[in-house]
Amino acid sequence: MMQEGGLPRAKKRFGQNFLVQPQIVERIVAAIRPASGDHLVEIGPGPGALTKSLLRLLPQFTVVELDRDMIAGLRALAPPEQLRVLQADALEVDFAALAGAGNALRIVGNLPYNVATPLIFHILEHAEQVRDMHFMLQKEVVDRVVAMPGSKAYGRLSVMIQAYCAVESLFTVAPGNFFPVPKVDSAFMRLIPHRPGLLPPHLQAPFARIVATSFAQRRKTLANNLRGILSADDLRGLQIDPGSRAETLDQAAFFRLAEATVEQGNRS
């Protein structure tokens, strides 16, 4: 079913807001700088505004679209040897298998607000197979991802994603550039996985746990949030003030906390 302007009808359950401003599409393409030989994957192409621009620059790439009503229109844009169309939930896609033995993936998408954060974490499970990511997200989410210690937006999301990626907010996009018009601003951002990774495999789960626990109650001090895990003396030994709050700690401090919990577990 089509709506005014010739666009397919957006489905609320998929969180669809279609990008309709060509100038913004051009800015996105300029930021990505796609090149022949790139192993590019577009998530949530919808009716294909960005897809069409990418087709002019790439001999082949893949799109992943959940909405089956979009599939026929996407397949009509180019032959399958140039445009591979997967009807799938990106949260269930095995990006490591998608990368295969080829070049690391370049992933781009205008992500639905309701799945953006879990989708980024899902992709980061395959960070070794990912060269970079460029995503349109709710501006508030981008602000949290790129936030620095001591800022109001800094929190669990900032610490977790920055542990795996260098992050950059590239530009803000006003609601009027989408249809249906969302209620909030969006922002386009870049994420580049660290090479080599900052977190060794044995530290990844303890790091996630200590970050979640540290931010569990933002108004409480670290000594309170980490009670039963690390003592005030343990924190002082790590050069961390027990009376400080999680939002004041930098990445290195959270690494030290995670390492301390692992060492503590090894002693017990």
From Swiss-Prot:
Write out the GO MF terms: 16S rRNA (adenine(1518)-N(6)/adenine(1519)-N(6))-dimethyltransferase activity; RNA binding
Residues bound to S-adenosyl-L-methionine are 17, 19, 44, 65, 89, 110
Query: Which domain of life does the protein's organism represent?
Result: Bacteria
A cellular component term, taken from the record's GO annotations: cytosol
Main enzyme class: transferase
Spell out the reaction equation it catalyses.
adenosine(1518)/adenosine(1519) in 16S rRNA + 4 S-adenosyl-L-methionine = N(6)-dimethyladenosine(1518)/N(6)-dimethyladenosine(1519) in 16S rRNA + 4 S-adenosyl-L-homocysteine + 4 H(+)
- For this protein, the Enzyme Commission number is 2.1.1.182
The reply to whether NAD figures as a keyword in the UniProt entry is: no
- Report the InterPro entries cross-referenced here: KsgA/Erm, rRNA_Ade_diMease-like_C, rRNA_Ade_Mease_Trfase_CS, rRNA_Ade_methylase_Trfase_N, rRNA_adenine_dimethylase, SAM-dependent_MTases_sf
> Which Cys pairs does UniProt list as disulfide-bonded?
none
Spell out the subcellular localization from the entry.
Cytoplasm
Listed PROSITE patterns: RRNA_A_DIMETH, SAM_RNA_A_N6_MT
Which Gene3D superfamilies does the annotation name? Ribosomal RNA adenine dimethylase-like, domain 2, Vaccinia Virus protein VP39
Q: Which UniProt keywords apply?
A: Cytoplasm, Methyltransferase, RNA-binding, rRNA processing, S-adenosyl-L-methionine, Transferase
* Keyword RNA-binding attached: yes
HAMAP family attached here?
16SrRNA_methyltr_A
Q: Which family does it belong to?
A: Belongs to the class I-like SAM-binding methyltransferase superfamily. rRNA adenine N(6)-methyltransferase family. RsmA subfamily.
Function of the molecule = Specifically dimethylates two adjacent adenosines (A1518 and A1519) in the loop of a conserved hairpin near the 3'-end of 16S rRNA in the 30S particle. May play a critical role in biogenesis of 30S subunits.
Q: What is this protein called?
A: Ribosomal RNA small subunit methyltransferase A
Encoding gene per record: rsmA
